[in-house]
């Protein structure tokens, strides 16, 4: 938990999921402060759009202006909602939209936290292009090291004249004025053939490894079990290639695709519809924080390629939460399979949570682990 006084109000903010208290990561950064410093409240005219507000620092500070919070992270939405409540601000003060929704017309102010993925930034800028005016104040912010020439060129190409500020507390801002430059249409969904399958994999802008199959998933697919029955989960599904493979290998199983990214879940849905339409009735698609709210003892197996970063921050908190949720939601003798970089040492984490862990396969970079839920149902 951390405190910030941004000039609009004094806030107490925390990350979501909460980091440990030994070495906590902050729920806000200098770029949030820098963005808010640029706004004189008398200048705010028309709707306020906030893009990629990680844990609500901007939304909480500007809540009295009823801002729209736009992004592709359900975790960020949950974190923002929790910080609104914690600071005594009504959740209804902020309107939440995912990045694929239509943006409000003629905004007065647009604040953008520059996302890690340039493809997501382009998708968002193209969406803004349809609604902003020459009078809209457009300001983006990030750590100085995360603003590159390619970032500035993208703003210039999609929206118009772009300048940057000096660094402040290692953060920089981008100021942009909309001039409606000529811009060719470009597909924001990328597709490629997955070798040895006949499948075409479709990837929306914010999907991990959208330009091709990542090597961890490739290794995982080589070792997926067959002849499973009941409900199984592709947890953190991304574009759904693991779930697709499970559908093909396990015709008696139903697959639940889960991710905190609406774009990932929609990509998974699209990939089942276009590649295995006959199996669509065996699928469920869920935008969720891991398996929050899912009943215990539901699943026969969970498959997971857990992330070890949240936005720009390295953290194992999300993976740790996924493992705990999997244990709760597995049936007795249900199995959790994960693929991960070897250096992350998830073997001991799984053994601590499940009481057991076995290595299924390993190579020079990745390891596939299996843990089994022990005990009797209470």
Curated annotation (Swiss-Prot):
Pfam families: MTS. Transmembrane segments: none annotated. Keywords: Cytoplasm, Methyltransferase, rRNA processing, S-adenosyl-L-methionine, Transferase. The keyword S-adenosyl-L-methionine applies. Its EC number is 2.1.1.174. GO terms for cellular component: cytoplasm. It comes from the Bacteria. Specifically methylates the guanine in position 1835 (m2G1835) of 23S rRNA. Belongs to the methyltransferase superfamily. RlmG family. This is Ribosomal RNA large subunit methyltransferase G. It comes from Salmonella arizonae (strain ATCC BAA-731 / CDC346-86 / RSK2980). The gene is rlmG.
């Amino acid at each position: 938990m951390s405190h910030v006084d941004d000039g609009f109000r004094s806030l107490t903010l925390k990350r979501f999921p909460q980091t440990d208290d030994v070495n906590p990561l902050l729920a806000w950064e200098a770029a949030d402060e820098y963005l808010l410093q640029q706004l004189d409240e008398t200048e705010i005219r028309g709707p306020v759009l906030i893009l990629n507000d990680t844990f609500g620092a901007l939304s909480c500070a500007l809540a009295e202006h009823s801002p729209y919070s736009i992004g592709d992270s359900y975790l960020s939405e949950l974190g923002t909602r929790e910080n609104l409540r914690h600071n005594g601000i009504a959740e209804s003060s902020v309107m939440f939209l995912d990045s694929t929704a239509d943006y409000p017309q003629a905004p007065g102010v647009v604040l953008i936290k520059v996302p890690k993925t340039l493809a997501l930034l382009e998708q968002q800028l193209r969406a803004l292009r349809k609604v902003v005016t020459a009078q809209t104040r457009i300001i983006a912010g990030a750590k100085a090291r995360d603003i590159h020439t390619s970032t500035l060129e993208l703003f210039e190409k999609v929206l118009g004249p772009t300048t940057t500020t000096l660094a402040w507390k290692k953060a920089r801002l981008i100021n942009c004025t909309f001039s409606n430059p000529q811009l060719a249409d470009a597909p924001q969904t990328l597709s490629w053939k997955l070798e040895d399958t006949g499948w075409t994999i479709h990837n929306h802008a914010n999907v991990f490894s959208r330009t091709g199959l990542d090597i961890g998933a490739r290794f995982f697919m080589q070792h997926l079990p067959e002849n499973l029955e009941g409900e199984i989960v592709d947890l953190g599904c991304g574009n759904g290639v693991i779930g697709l493979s499970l559908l093909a290998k396990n015709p008696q199983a139903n697959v639940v695709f889960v991710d905190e990214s609406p774009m990932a879940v929609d990509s998974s849905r699209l990939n089942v519809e276009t590649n295995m339409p006959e199996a669509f009735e065996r699928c469920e698609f869920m935008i969720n924080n891991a398996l929050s709210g899912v009943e215990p003892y539901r699943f026969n197996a969970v498959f997971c390629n857990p992330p070890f970063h949240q936005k720009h921050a390295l953290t194992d908190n999300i993976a740790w939460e996924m493992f705990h949720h999997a244990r709760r939601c597995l049936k007795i003798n249900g199995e959790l399979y994960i693929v991960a970089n070897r250096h992350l040492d998830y073997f001991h984490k799984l053994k601590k949570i499940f009481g057991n862990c076995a290595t299924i396969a390993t190579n020079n970079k990745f390891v596939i682990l299996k843990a089994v839920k022990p005990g009797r149902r209470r």
